Amino acid sequence: MNQLVDPKVVIALDYQDKQQALHFISQLDPKHCRLKVGKEMFTHFGPEFVKQLVAKEFDVFLDLKFHDIPNTVASAVKVAADLGVWMVNVHASGGRRMMEAAKKILEPYGTNAPLLIAVTVLTSMDQSDLQELGIELSPAEQVKRLAKLAKLSGLDGVVCSAHEAQELKTLLGAEFKLITPGIRPMGSDAGDQRRIMTPKQAIDAGSDYLVIGRPITRATNPVEVLKNINDSLV
């Protein structure tokens, strides 16, 4: 597999056993993918695990979706930056002041600052879920509303469904990064993600980075699956 200038695939790690996780990671080349550490693994293994991945030269997306008062979120984002992560996220529904505080605290890091990304509408949520929260907008409308707020707050991009990507690129510009979960290679089970696309469809729609978990982590030959995905994006 040739070295990729900007790997598009972010592998979502979902292991409860640290040694299993490290064995899986040992098969990967950081030139060909990035890694996502979410709440479950971070709670299991802590920041030292993230440091291990960074030391192996992987770009790490720390997916903890911070949502709290501005000062608390800013402090947490600073700690993430000190871990050396490539990307960190916050909930856009925390509001503009929270997002602005998180962005401001990263200023001293300059070009070494992680990408600061907002979560809009979780891909498992549909219209009925939003209505139960008192939101009468469609998922797509709510995504646009929160994505615009994130850009106004100075953030680098948003997590969004591939189905919103094309419109968001047009609305918010090419430099505003779109990170897309709910990606399944052809023939994969949809799992718990309601709004899904294949990797090529998502990139063609405007997504910049693709979060893919079980189709790679649970594959018999994960390196081959990753290679096939990367090849499909060339």
UniProtKB/Swiss-Prot annotation:
Binding, substrate: 14, 36, 63-72, 123, 184, 193, 213-214
GO molecular function, one term: orotidine-5'-phosphate decarboxylase activity
Catalytic residues as annotated in Swiss-Prot or TrEMBL: 65 (proton donor)
Coiled coil: none
PROSITE patterns assigned to the protein according to its UniProt record, in alphabetical order: OMPDECASE
Keywords: Decarboxylase, Lyase, Pyrimidine biosynthesis
One matching Pfam family: OMPdecase
EC number: 4.1.1.23
GO biological process: 'de novo' pyrimidine nucleobase biosynthetic process; 'de novo' UMP biosynthetic process
Pathway(s) the chain acts in: Pyrimidine metabolism; UMP biosynthesis via de novo pathway; UMP from orotate: step 2/2
Taxonomy, superkingdom: Bacteria
Reactions that this protein is recorded to catalyse: orotidine 5'-phosphate + H(+) = UMP + CO2
Lyase found in the keyword field: yes
InterPro entries linked to this entry: Aldolase_TIM (IPR013785), OMPdecase (IPR014732), OMPdecase_AS (IPR018089), OMPdecase_bac (IPR047596), OMPdeCOase_dom (IPR001754), RibuloseP-bd_barrel (IPR011060)
Subunit architecture: Homodimer.
HAMAP family noted in UniProt: OMPdecase_type1_B
Family named by the database record: Belongs to the OMP decarboxylase family. Type 1 subfamily.
NCBIfam families: PRK00230.1 (NF001273), pyrF (TIGR01740)
Function of the molecule: Catalyzes the decarboxylation of orotidine 5'-monophosphate (OMP) to uridine 5'-monophosphate (UMP).
Name used for this protein in its record: Orotidine 5'-phosphate decarboxylase
Gene name of the encoded protein: pyrF
